[in-house]
């Protein structure tokens, strides 16, 4: 079984793996209970909050994060996983956003990305209506509302490419976005 071999190899090498996190998470029952309660709360209320995990090198922080990723994804939640580094420093939020978006997994998907879900949507579909209403009412800015509406409405491939780039974090000037929105 290839999955079993990958898990054994990850354990042998000490490299954190989502597959390992899926099967070996029972060693921390209190933390797992807290994570489970928090995920249930997010599922029920639609609101999330923060949770700080700290520890020394080799104490299993990444293993725990992989386990949480699997739990949330298994609970039909949108999840994203990224590592902060020199290439993705916390003080450069546009880089964090790009990495976050490129590592976003939709429920039931094994590969990251969300544009494939948008491509089949029209502005009049029920899901699009929910997304647009949320973007218009719940966010601090209306930019995402206009981006989504334009992306779903345009037939022009160049406009679609620019809107896609903006959604993925390669931001387009607001003047150009206004021109596309018409």
Predicted ranges, named:
Residues 59, 63-182:
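P-loop NTPase nucleotide-binding core
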Residues 36, 55, 72-74:
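Conserved ATP-binding subdomain of kinase catalytic cores across diverse folds
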């Amino acid at each position: 079984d290839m999955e079993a071999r990958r898990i054994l190899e990850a354990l042998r090498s000490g490299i954190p793996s989502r597959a390992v996190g899926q099967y070996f998470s029972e060693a921390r029952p209190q933390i797992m209970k807290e994570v489970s309660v928090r995920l249930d709360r997010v599922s029920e209320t639609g609101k999330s909050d923060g949770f700080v995990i700290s520890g020394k090198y080799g104490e299993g922080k990444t293993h725990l994060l992989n386990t949480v990723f699997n739990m949330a994804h298994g609970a039909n939640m949108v999840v994203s996983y990224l590592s902060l580094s020199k290439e993705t420093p916390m003080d450069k939020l546009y880089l964090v956003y790009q990495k976050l978006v490129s590592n976003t997994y939709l429920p039931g998907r094994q590969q990251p990305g969300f544009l494939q879900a948008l491509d089949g949507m029209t502005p009049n579909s029920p899901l699009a209506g929910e997304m647009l209403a949320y973007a218009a009412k719940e966010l601090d800015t209306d930019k995402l509302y206009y981006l989504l509406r334009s992306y779903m409405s345009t037939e022009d491939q160049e406009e679609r490419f620019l809107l896609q780039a903006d959604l993925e974090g390669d931001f387009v000037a607001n003047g150009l976005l206004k021109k596309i929105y018409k």
